[in-house]
Amino acid sequence: MAASQLAALEGVDSGPRVPGASPGFLYSEGQRLALEALLSKGAEAFQTCVQREELWPFLSADEVQGLAAAAEDWTVAKQEPSGMAEGATTTDVDAGSLSYWPGQSEQPAPVLRLGWPVDSAWKGITRAQLYTQPPGEGQPPLKELVRLEIQAAHKLVAVVMDVFTDPDLLLDLVDAATRRWVPVYLLLDRQQLPAFLELAQQLGVNPWNTENVDVRVVRGCSFQSRWRRQVSGTVREKFVLLDGERVISGSYSFTWSDARLHRGLVTLLTGEIVDAFSLEFRTLYAASCPLPPAPPQKPSVIGGLQRGRSPHRVSRRRSVAPASPPPPDGPLAHRLAACRVSPATPGPALSDILRSVQRARTPSGPPARPSRSMWDLSRLSQLSGSSDGDNELKKSWGSKDTPAKALMRQRGTGGGPWGEVDSRPPWGGALPLPPAHRLRYLSPARRRFGGDATFKLQEPRGVRPSDWAPRAGLGGQP
């Protein structure tokens, strides 16, 4: 500024200024010829053309090598899917444009596949907040800022990114689309697409069929030479549009290196400026292309061995009966014998299956208590006077009705030493439990003289017991 003022005072001519409307401000015929020589003939032809046209070196050595390697036949590139978005009208014949740098497109912005929030209200004054990496005092890191804003979105997430290899951010986008049902648009650079597809495959995310996620490819501007050679640029725009209300834009790429190693900055914008980013995203969406077809699934290989095909995976179901072999040619008797159905082998009977199941079944509960037989009762009667502990056992045995007693009552022999009579009615019923004092176990001395005599000695003569009843059985008659 001071130098120009000093030159104006001294009257020194600083040279003619190129106006912005002049073609020479953005276009150079010498640079175009040099670039055509680079794409068609190589780096040596490019240097020769630069010297012949007396141009300043406008390409570095790395740019020269990159452009020469990226050059391709534009007739092959033209066969790729059209970059027009869904809803836009196209024609087979490219009519071109009447102006070299058209200011506006004749076609309206296309309708996006997952919808787009429309809010015509004024969003307020534009406000900006700067975040850096490494973070400043009291500020979150750039990756944390982006993740928090994505997790807080509830209407829309639209991402334009050059390199996308961060798994955490991809999982956040998938979670927003599938769980919170937030439309997610993702526009990626064409040259960096293989890295993103590899990341999605490792995470088990299908970018072609993930619900509520639209992934498309964007390429930079193209230069086409007269020798059918073409070179395309990359996408350097990086911003995230959230709910149509907030925008995160800056130098941060969705990579681990940008989150941990590289220095960068982003700006969180709100207000009226968001409408400009919304228009830019829809413009890029209109120029984008769908993803290339998904590669066929390869059989998985574990430890150098190819895993066989699972028999439980059914690729196609057909309701077709199995074809029977054709009948052999010959006499009618042979053909009838071939068509005769052979008798089926008889299977096991139901009773055999039930017995096998019962044998194989293991008891899950406590073992069943064995029943008392008549032999057990006679054995207990022999041990009646042994000890006090045995008396308790005798009482427990005498106070319970066992299957042996029930069998003896049914046969008329009685379940006790006195020959109990079956007191059930003729039509049947439950067996009553006998009183405990009526069940007596005889000691060896009592068995020697007889049970009845011993019982009579214990009671006064001529006195009839109050609970005496006619008994039938061994040694007792009514």
UniProtKB/Swiss-Prot annotation:
Residues 292-334, 359-436, 452-478 are annotated as: Disordered. GO terms for molecular function: protein kinase binding. SUPFAM superfamilies: Phospholipase D/nuclease. It comes from the Eukaryota. Changing D243A: Decreased interaction with CSNK1A1 and CSNK1E. Gene3D superfamilies: Endonuclease Chain A. Residues 379-388 have a biased composition (Polar residues). It holds the Pfam family SACK1. The keyword Amino-acid biosynthesis does not apply. Residues 1-293 are annotated as: DUF1669. One of its GO terms (biological process) is signal transduction. Keywords: Cytoplasm. It is found in: Cytoplasm; Cytoplasm, Perinuclear region. Residues 309-319 have a biased composition (Basic residues). Belongs to the FAM83 family. May play a role in MAPK signaling. Directly interacts (via DUF1669) with CSNK1A1, CSNK1A1L, CSNK1D and CSNK1E. May interact with RAF1. All members of the FAM83 family of proteins share a conserved N-terminal DUF1669 (domain of unknown function 1669) domain of about 300 amino acids. This domain mediates the interaction with casein kinase 1 (CK1) isoforms. Therefore, it has been proposed to rename DUF1669 the polypeptide anchor of CK1 domain. This is Protein FAM83E. It comes from Homo sapiens. The lineage of its organism: Eukaryota, Metazoa, Chordata, Craniata, Vertebrata. The gene is FAM83E.
